[in-house]
Structures are given as C-alpha cells and as structure tokens.
C-alpha cells in the first residue's frame, strides 16, 4: 500500500481517530478487575487490544477486499448462469415445442368433433377434461423435473432400449402415445 502526501505516517502523527471502550470494574477488592480489552488508561500496555484503534488504512483495505469479493462473486454467477442457459436452452426449446404440439393436437381434436356435428356433450366434456389434464401434467415445472435428466442435464435414455441414442422423456412420451 502506498502512502499519500498527507498521510499520517509521513507526518509522524498518530492516527486521528481512536475508539475506546469504557472501563467497568466488577466489584471492589479482589476479583477479576477491569474487563479485558478496555484500554482507556495506558496505550503502552502489552495486553491492550489493538483493534480499538481505527486506522484509516484498514478501512481502505477492508473496502477494497469487500469490493473485490463482491465483484468476483458477481462475475462468477453471471458467467456460470449464462453458460448454463446457453447449454440448456436448445434442449428446453425442443421439449417446449413437443408440449405445444401435444396441446395443439388436443385442441384440434375438440374442434374436429365440433365440426363433425357431434352433439354428444359427454365427448366434449371428456375432451375438455383430457386437455385440462394434459395442460396440468405438461406444466413446465413437471416437464423440467430433475428426475428426467442425468447429472449433465441431458435427457435420460430410454429404459427399454439403452442402445439407441434417442432421448426419452417419460411424461411427453406418455402424451404422445395417447395422441396416436
């Protein structure tokens, strides 16, 4: 650390700011005496606490350390967050497209039945219930559960055929099979 022109160390002055604690005696006579760390009387005492002196350089050093720490943490979070987003976005987009296709097919099935002139309200209710069930199950929170991904955040391979290179998402496959 370099000194500035008006620094107290160049002027051979003592630091201008000093904090002191009050001395409290615990009873009169024999006993513990003053509370340790209180050094009102004697600055030359070898048992005195140096932390009671506020040295301006310490404040500067402390603020630089803190700023460096905060900057480092922020930069690390930003870089790892961006890298995770870049790696996971394509896979998430594919899953989102599949979910959208499933929900669109269910809506189209409802509309096709209405166009064909089916007056059976039970079928409409069944299709509506099925669509609402799909919407609930295919919610983003359910689709992106950790159980569907390996430790590298790639979709797990099919349990039936581990030799294929195809990814497998149990929930999406369930609804794709229901569409057939």
UniProtKB/Swiss-Prot annotation:
Subcellular location, record wording: Cytoplasm; Nucleus
GO cellular component annotations of the record: cytoplasm; nucleus
Q: Which GO terms describe its biological process?
A: protein maturation
Region (deca-GX3 motif): which ranges? 68-108
Biased amino acid composition, Acidic residues: 39-49
Provide the residue span(s) of the region labelled Disordered. Answer: 1-53, 112-131
* Family, similarity comment: Belongs to the YAE1 family.
Q: Which PANTHER family match?
A: PROTEIN YAE1 HOMOLOG (PTHR18829:SF0)
Q: How does it assemble?
A: May form a complex with LTO1.
- Give the protein's recorded name: Protein YAE1
Q: Which organism is it from?
A: Candida albicans (strain SC5314 / ATCC MYA-2876)
């Amino acid at each position: 650390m370099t000194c500035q022109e008006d620094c107290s160390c160049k002027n051979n002055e003592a630091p201008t700011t000093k904090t002191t604690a009050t001395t409290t005696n615990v009873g009169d006579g024999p006993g513990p005496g003053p509370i340790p760390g209180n050094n009102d009387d004697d600055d030359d005492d070898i048992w005195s606490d140096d932390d009671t002196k506020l040295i301006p350089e310490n404040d500067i050093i402390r603020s630089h350390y803190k700023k460096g720490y905060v900057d480092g943490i922020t930069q690390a979070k930003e870089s790892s967050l961006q890298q995770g987003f870049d790696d996971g976005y394509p896979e998430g987009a594919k899953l989102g497209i599949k979910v959208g296709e499933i929900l669109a097919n269910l809506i189209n099935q409802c509309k096709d039945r209405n166009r064909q002139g089916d007056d059976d309200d039970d079928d409409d209710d069944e299709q509506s219930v099925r669509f609402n069930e799909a919407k609930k199950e295919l919610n983003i929170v359910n689709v992106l559960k950790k159980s569907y991904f390996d430790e590298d955040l790639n979709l797990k391979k099919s349990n039936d055929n581990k030799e294929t290179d195809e990814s497998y998402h149990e929930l999406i496959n369930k609804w794709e099979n229901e569409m057939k």
